[in-house]
């Protein structure tokens, strides 16, 4: 049967992954007082693979077999660093606003929306959603600006909704040439969940909620038509204005042809009539008195000098209620734009109908906003089904991350345990087998060199030989000796045996210690094979991993 996994499912999974980093941790020996305590994601980023690929310039694509995912990545793991909640964010593809570019407009009926450039980030790190693009996908030449909650209309007739501003701290961690961070700062109780972006986004989210669900906030002019009557002017003295009548002037072409058009008041001096109006029922040319229905509230009688606009009546019908719009023009007789007076609510489908005795050919498309209104949830609205994990590997990280050798593999492991079975909590982890050297023959062990234990016959590859006293190995394999070694397993390295390198180095040892993690514990969730990354004592690696859900 036909079926679909929706984008909501992908976004939900991405949200759950990020939110898991803030959940309560359960550690061995602690009383379980809340089921949520078991949901914590204890995540580490690890590096591995000191030995070359078959072609270091073209690393192989990782495979998700049991051998690789469960076992092999543990064998060449060098070190790991804990990932915190501030190291993870949902992200979206980066589209920089550029003058001369064309941008798609948001459309509730577009099932390919998230594959299109319908939002931008400006050079001041403001993110805007495109709601209208000059009715025809016209070129954008005016950069959107401002951090307010109202829709921004630029001179090129694009309409933009400010969504949020990327803070400096989040830009440093999560902005790349290809991605930018997104988030929702408001919790369900309207408190701020994230404080890193201050109140700009919070204000946008709160204001969006006033629109409600299924509001018509934009109406696209698909075809402008011709022959329509438009007039603007002011209410004149010489007539006692009522809730259904006023004397008007300002347009030499006003005739009885304006009947059945709409009149909306665009300004007032205190009557509160701005944005209100009705459908014209009559016009007397001699007195210039226009009448309309339905009647305004008694407190909103238009006063002398109030501005008005007359245009073809546009009705929004559908499965919702309350949408109220008016038309304006930019050229003689054509519909230039639709001003939304009230968006209504609960529309899932809507149709715009032009009702007038003068003019033909206009086609309008109501655009229904997302749940909660534009700006309520940037993650949902902009397609945040990507997650970025950022970790800075600073110098040697207390000696756990080698600065003498390179690495070719980066991964994420969740819920690893210490070698004693406890939940791992340290900020950095050394996963090498570490051998304490008692004496050696003055020939240094070289990076990547194969080392063999004389008694155990176990082997390993050299990560580094630090201070001529500590030898660290990965890719360790057990030998044929039946004597148990440092980890109580037969064939493992033994303390006090001689280690010999393939290049002639030899050392007597006093102790062997395994990696901090219990090997094969936890789940490896992500692997990325890379060309060799060379490290140095004064070097910082800013690692950014992108996971698509």
Model region roles, listed by residue range:
Residues 1-138, 147-189, 402-437, 442-453, ...:
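Extended assembly-interface regions of large multimeric machines
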Residues 143-145:
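Short, solvent-exposed beta-strand-to-loop segments that form ligand-recognition rims
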Residues 156-549:
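Conserved, function-critical positions that sit in or immediately flank catalytic
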């Amino acid at each position: 049967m036909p079926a679909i996994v929706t984008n909501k499912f992908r976004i939900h999974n991405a949200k759950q992954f990020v939110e898991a980093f803030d959940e309560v941790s359960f550690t061995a020996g602690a009383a379980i007082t809340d089921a949520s305590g078991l949901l914590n994601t204890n995540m580490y980023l690890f590096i591995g693979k000191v030995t070359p690929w078959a072609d270091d310039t073209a690393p192989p694509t990782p495979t998700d077999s049991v051998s690789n995912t469960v076992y092999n990545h543990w064998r060449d793991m060098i070190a790991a660093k804990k990932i915190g909640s501030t190291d993870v964010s949902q992200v979206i593809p980066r589209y920089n606003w550029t003058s001369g570019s064309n941008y798609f407009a948001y459309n509730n009926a577009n099932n390919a929306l998230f594959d299109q450039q319908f939002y931008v980030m400006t050079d001041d790190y403001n993110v805007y959603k495109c709601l209208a693009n000059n009715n025809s996908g016209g070129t954008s030449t005016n950069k959107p600006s401002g951090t307010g909650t109202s829709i921004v209309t630029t001179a090129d007739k694009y309409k933009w909704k400010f969504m949020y501003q990327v803070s400096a701290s989040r830009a440093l961690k999560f902005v790349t040439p290809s991605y930018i961070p997104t988030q929702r700062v408001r919790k369900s109780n309207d408190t701020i969940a994230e404080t890193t972006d201050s109140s700009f986004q919070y204000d946008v989210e709160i204001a969006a909620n006033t629109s409600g669900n299924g509001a018509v906030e934009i109406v696209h002019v698909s075809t402008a038509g011709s022959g329509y009557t438009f007039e603007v002017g002011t209410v004149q003295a010489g007539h006692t204005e009522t809730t259904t009548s006023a004397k008007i002037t300002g347009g030499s072409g006003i005739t009885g042809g304006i009947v059945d058009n709409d009149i909306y008041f665009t300004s007032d001096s205190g009557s509160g009539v701005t944005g209100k109006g009705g459908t014209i029922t009559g016009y007397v040319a001699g007195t210039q008195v226009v009448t309309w229905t339905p009647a305004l509230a008694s407190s909103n009688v238009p006063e002398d000098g109030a501005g008005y606009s007359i245009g073809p009546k546009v009705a929004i019908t559908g499965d919702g209620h309350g949408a109220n719009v008016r038309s304006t023009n930019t050229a003689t007789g054509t519909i230039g734009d639709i001003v939304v007076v009230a968006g209504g609510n609960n529309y899932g489908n809507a149709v715009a109908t032009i009702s007038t005795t003068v003019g033909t050919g206009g086609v309008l498309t109501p655009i229904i906003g997302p749940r909660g209104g534009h700006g309520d949830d940037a993650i949902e609205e902009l397609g945040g089904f990507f997650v970025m994990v950022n970790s800075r590997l600073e110098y040697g990280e207390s000696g756990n991350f080698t600065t003498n050798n390179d690495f070719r593999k980066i991964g994420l492991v969740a819920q690893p345990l210490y070698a004693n079975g406890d939940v791992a909590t340290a900020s950095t982890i050394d996963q090498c087998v570490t051998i304490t050297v008692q004496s050696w023959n003055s020939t240094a062990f070289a990076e990547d060199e194969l080392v063999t234990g004389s008694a155990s016959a176990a082997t390993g590859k050299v990560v580094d030989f630090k201070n001529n006293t500590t030898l660290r190995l990965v890719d360790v394999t057990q030998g044929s000796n039946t004597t148990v070694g440092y980890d109580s397993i037969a064939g493992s390295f033994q303390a006090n045996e001689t280690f010999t390198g393939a290049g002639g180095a030899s050392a007597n040892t006093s102790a062997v210690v395994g990696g901090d993690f219990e090997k094969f514990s936890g789940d490896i969730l992500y692997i990325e094979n890379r060309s060799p990354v060379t490290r140095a004592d004064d070097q910082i690696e800013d690692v950014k991993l992108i996971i698509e859900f």
